[in-house]
């Protein structure tokens, strides 16, 4: 960085040294300016003009700038590109500054701490995470600065990458010397990595930092007793927030420890395959609520915090059966009470995002309209609470008790802030008339000046007898009294001459000068006083942060409960029940998303039953044609289990389920070129995770395992996977396949059953019935599906000919099924099939009559024919 000689640039350099890794936006009047390398970078990334300072002195300093009132948009663009941006503001009035205006960094915006609406979706969290380690244990803490949520958990080091991927953090804090994630681990993760000094993560420093901030004698009440790694990660987050936000952070929750074993585990592969949050083909979709996803079907929440809570529940279904049952009780009561549900949703629709409004208030970034929105939202809570004060469900009664009406905070805000405040405080009109007497007087002086001048003019005309006397104002002379030359002899002695014109004289008086001074000072005084009053009410509202946070959490849960009740009522969902028998019994189950799409297209979704248990029906092998509904059947079973454990009613006539600890899916295939993995490698890696991680309480969904390689290799692997799950894992499993040979396993393994997707043949055409029933399919109908896809008729006819020839000549692929000597898993005896024509020629040979030279010639011909085939 160049050594600039001016006081301004020395000030800039001094401040820039505080944030060497951030772009510094330096407030100069009505602009934020960037200098040196920051300017070059910003001009390139923002596509704005790069200029230079001090060109004429031969010491040009690159610079660029953006208007202060439009800065947030530019900051957002830089954050989206992964930059950190430090905001340096003028912290004293330029008019009062004796020399150089004092400037300070007021906040540092990073990907993990962004709050602007351009960067943070209303129904998604924006997480900042930190990774800590103590001994053999690792921890991941996360916070959403925009809502105050602050949580931490511990795990094994090898689990960190998966935890970060599932969390979806935008920025992650690491100790500089922590080699937790290898390149292989990190290659699928998308976050900004920020390294902090090692001492920030130490137990003693973090423990003290957390206790001091939250005013606690011990962290044991947060569940952090004897959890050094968790304390280090949580303390590092708080340290970083203090450094970047430069604010009180009163809206943050205490860091709460959560045990990952309390939730069903859904890894990123399962979340993607089941389309819980995003569709597999996002390019074909519009906005988040228009997308064909499970969240899109379930989310009828009316508040931002309710939408975020529903999303979190969907990603982390509960394993606490008592909690699930309480949620279902509440959903059931609201589902049955249509009028109550409608009134609740009406009241909820008037409540804005309390969590994010509160965050802005406590961080000091809330403008007049933000504070008014908070006040008006709090004003709605008493009416909301009155709606459900006689409910029976324990969860609803608990929510009612937790819902602080906050009428005092609402009055505090609404008594002060005007009904239509400006977007920016500097535009004036923020404070309500009648709230502050001095402010009212100043406004009266400023706004009613014309009336006051008219009164002076009338009085002076009467006093002097000059009917043409005028009181006027201009920017050069201010207020003045103008008298024509013919009447100047009538001017009173207290008139002071101010200006002589050709046809008139202009005067002033002590009263007029005093009024002029008051008027000119009034606007500045109004703005200063409004700033003081607004700042005061914002601080007083922030003092109630924990009360508001608690109320926001209650409103969010009520919103989610009402949303699930609404969805259940509209879509004929039924309450699931849970049992300890290990049985999974679903009657007339439906896929929530496909059902919705089918109804939109005036079609009818075909429901299906499912039965699995821990013994005789542990694993179902499902065969049938493409497009027959196998994948839908697999997914809907997994989704019904997930919906049940978030506390939702399910799309089925009835569902009796065990509490599942983890759902695995291996559906579809795609290359992962970024990691150098082929389709088959991705498939095998995902399958390996399932086999190595699943427990008897898990539910596994496998679709076409082995199809990414040669037929016999794929069949062998699929066969072995089924055996392994049946013999060792013992997890309930649905296994869809086109390897019809696998259906023979139902005769060999006691817990395997066959299911098939039925079709109806009509000549050369087929009708997909999409009904799953016991049995096994003997054909895949691939050619019929190809015909439906529009392949040329000549290709279809040729394919049928080849298929008939292949079916006549190919031996059974599975070969002979035998038991190993120790009665272990069934083995497949396979050999290369010999073409039918060659085999017939060999059978027809009369060896007794064949001469040696003829035998050699025949052997050569057969060899050539085999090579050609």
Curated annotation (Swiss-Prot):
Family: Belongs to the DNA mismatch repair MutS family.
Organism encoding this protein: Solibacter usitatus (strain Ellin6076)
UniProt keyword annotation of Protein biosynthesis present: no
Binding site for ATP: 624-631
A GO CC term attached to the entry: cytosol
Key words of the record: ATP-binding, DNA damage, DNA repair, DNA-binding, Nucleotide-binding
One Gene Ontology term of the molecular function aspect: ATP binding
Keyword hit for Transit peptide: no
Stated role: This protein is involved in the repair of mismatches in DNA. It is possible that it carries out the mismatch recognition step. This protein has a weak ATPase activity.
Pfam families: MutS_I, MutS_II, MutS_III, MutS_IV, MutS_V
Superkingdom as given in the UniProt entry: Bacteria
PANTHER family: DNA MISMATCH REPAIR PROTEIN MSH1, MITOCHONDRIAL, DNA MISMATCH REPAIR PROTEIN MUTS FAMILY MEMBER
Family annotation (InterPro entries): DNA_mismatch_repair_MutS, DNA_mismatch_repair_MutS-lik_N, DNA_mismatch_repair_MutS/MSH, DNA_mismatch_repair_MutS_C, DNA_mismatch_repair_MutS_clamp, DNA_mismatch_repair_MutS_core, DNA_mismatch_repair_MutS_N, DNA_mismatch_repair_MutS_sf
PROSITE patterns: DNA_MISMATCH_REPAIR_2
GO terms classed as biological process: mismatch repair
The protein, known as: DNA mismatch repair protein MutS
Gene name in the database record: mutS
